[in-house]
Amino acid sequence: MAIRPVYRPTIVKKRTKKFIRHQSDRYSKLKRNWRKPKGIDNRVRRRFKGQYLMPNIGYGSNKKTRHMLPTGFRKVLVHNVKELEVLMMQNRKFCAEIAHGGSSKKRKSIVERAQQLSIRVTYASARLRSQENE
């Protein structure tokens, strides 16, 4: 049976569109990633009507749902089986995410131990070889 979170609130984002960099649509050398405009005459910095919006604190998510996955869990990065034991009592609030640097052998042991402790693992099947391929 799948582990369910204690409660699963509706996650409301105040803004889902990305904030894009001023004039990134005009010049290909300017990437779309947000950079704060610093120019003395810049229209975006001066918040003129019809210009791109700048990110600010008002766009922040609700404190209760911040960093929450759509499943209702929060992620905790796990490097080995010992770090997984910390989540044993909190398995209805947090789920484990296996760190990128772990080998497939270590990943396999973490997934097995998580199943014993009934801890959910995000993307548990990644980099696990099936029996046919071995």
From Swiss-Prot:
GO MF terms, alphabetically ordered: structural constituent of ribosome
InterPro entries: Ribosomal_eL32 (IPR001515), Ribosomal_eL32_CS (IPR018263), Ribosomal_eL32_sf (IPR036351)
Keyword Ribonucleoprotein annotated: yes
Sorted UniProt keywords: Ribonucleoprotein, Ribosomal protein
Domain of life of the organism encoding this protein: Eukaryota
Gene Ontology terms: biological process: translation
Organism per entry: Apis mellifera
Name the UniProt record assigns to this protein: Large ribosomal subunit protein eL32
